[in-house]
């Protein structure tokens, strides 16, 4: 029996999200629905020093946009700030080299939406932590 999972493309999702991907034969990004404001699509709770705060990548605030159409705001500058925050917080972690590798592989020049950013990072993380090939489907039903 084949298993299919469907989730919105979250911003640096939690471990359970990746367990769902791992246990699926096909994973579908649900990104052709309205962008849910104040959600995990563009932010996540993250530990900085000894406190928990929000880590996010700012987006352009347009109402009634689909997730796949929400554009990043000042993407180059904000991405550099994001990398610095993550690096500062995780540089002592034994697996930091993997995080650093993913952050440096993100083609920020070619990414224009939060959807593209999230899908790239989710697939990059999944490729590192899983040995099996995962099939991903986009909003138009195309394999990625």
Task: List the predicted regions and their residue ranges.
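Residues lining hydrophobic/aromatic ligand-binding pockets adjacent to catalytic sites
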Residues: 1-144
């Amino acid at each position: 029996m084949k298993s299919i999972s469907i989730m919105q493309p979250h911003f640096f999702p939690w471990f359970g999200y990746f367990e769902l991907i791992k246990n699926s034969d096909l994973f579908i990004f649900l990104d052709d629905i309205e962008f849910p404001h104040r959600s995990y699509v563009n932010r996540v709770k993250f530990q900085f020093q000894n406190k928990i705060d929000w880590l996010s990548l700012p987006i352009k605030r347009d109402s009634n946009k689909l997730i796949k159409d929400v554009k990043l705001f000042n993407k180059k500058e904000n991405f550099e700030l994001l990398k610095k925050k993550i690096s500062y917080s995780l540089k002592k972690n034994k697996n930091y080299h993997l995080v650093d590798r993913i952050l440096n592989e993100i083609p920020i020049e070619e990414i224009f939406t939060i959807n593209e950013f999230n899908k790239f990072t989710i697939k990059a993380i999944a490729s590192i932590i899983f040995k099996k090939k995962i099939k991903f489907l986009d909003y138009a039903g195309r394999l990625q």
